[in-house]
């Protein structure tokens, strides 16, 4: 009976040793590097196996530090949940100065025309343009002819929102170009402040301040 136990013990040790050698062979093929001691638990068997510490996924094997004592001194890998940061919301671009002028003028659409009026409740043509520009901190000449003469000339094809457009011979009327071929202006006492096509009146010139 005792002899039978010895035989079983010898067989177990041989099987364990074979497992260790097989593990070592796998590691050696995967990554030839510095040798680490591999101990077969419950036996006196230990072998040095090159590269075993770098075997992919080795640290995830339960109880592996009993086989490879050097792994017990290494920090266990930390599992991180995959986190995908949502893209930060893009801030809306700040309105250009020209667009801010248009926006100010547009708030007065429907206001009555008043000769010599500069707002905020009634306007004449150059009174509207002067008032709208003042809302963005810009001071421009008061009369339509002075505005047309003192700004930087702009070609019809290069008009941008906020430019001042003059109409009729002698630039006797002005309005604010609002984009897309339209102008906001205070036309006359029979027409409240409105937005019309540039073709509504004969074009004279355009300027930018």
Swiss-Prot record:
It comes from Corynebacterium glutamicum (strain ATCC 13032 / DSM 20300 / JCM 1318 / BCRC 11384 / CCUG 27702 / LMG 3730 / NBRC 12168 / NCIMB 10025 / NRRL B-2784 / 534). Residues 1-35 form the signal peptide. The keyword Hydrolase applies. Residues 95-209 form the NlpC/P60 domain. It comes from the Bacteria. Pfam families: NLPC_P60. InterPro entries: NLP_P60_dom, Papain-like_cys_pep_sf, PG_Endopeptidase_C40. The active site is at 125 (nucleophile), 173 (proton acceptor), 185. The keyword Transmembrane does not apply. Its main location: secreted. It is an enzyme of class 3 (hydrolase). GO terms for cellular component: extracellular region. Belongs to the peptidase C40 family. Gene3D superfamilies: endopeptidase domain like (from Nostoc punctiforme). Its EC number is 3.4.-.-. GO terms for biological process: proteolysis. This is Probable endopeptidase Cgl2188. It is found in: Secreted. One of its GO terms (molecular function) is cysteine-type peptidase activity. Keywords: Hydrolase, Protease, Secreted, Signal, Thiol protease.
């Amino acid at each position: 009976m005792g002899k039978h136990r010895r035989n079983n013990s010898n067989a177990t040790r041989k099987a364990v040793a074979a497992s260790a050698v097989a593990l070592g062979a796998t590691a050696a093929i995967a990554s030839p590097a510095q040798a680490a001691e591999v101990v077969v638990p419950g036996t006196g068997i230990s072998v040095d196996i090159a590269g075993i510490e770098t075997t992919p996924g080795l640290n995830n094997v339960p109880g592996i530090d009993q086989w490879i004592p050097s792994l017990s001194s290494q920090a266990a890998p930390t599992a991180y949940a995959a986190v995908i940061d949502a893209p930060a919301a893009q801030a809306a671009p700040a309105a250009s100065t020209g667009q801010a002028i248009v926006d100010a003028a547009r708030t007065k659409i429907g206001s009555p025309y008043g000769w010599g009026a500069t707002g905020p409740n009634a306007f004449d043509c150059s009174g509207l343009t002067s008032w709208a520009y003042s809302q963005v901190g810009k001071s421009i000449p008061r009369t339509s002819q002075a505005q047309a003469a003192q700004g930087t000339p702009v070609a019809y094809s290069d008009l941008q929102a906020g430019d001042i457009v003059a109409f009729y011979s002698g630039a006797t009327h002005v309005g604010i170009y609002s984009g897309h071929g339209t102008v906001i202006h205070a036309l006359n006492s029979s027409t409240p402040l409105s937005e019309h096509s540039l073709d509504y009146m004969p074009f004279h010139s355009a300027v930018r301040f």
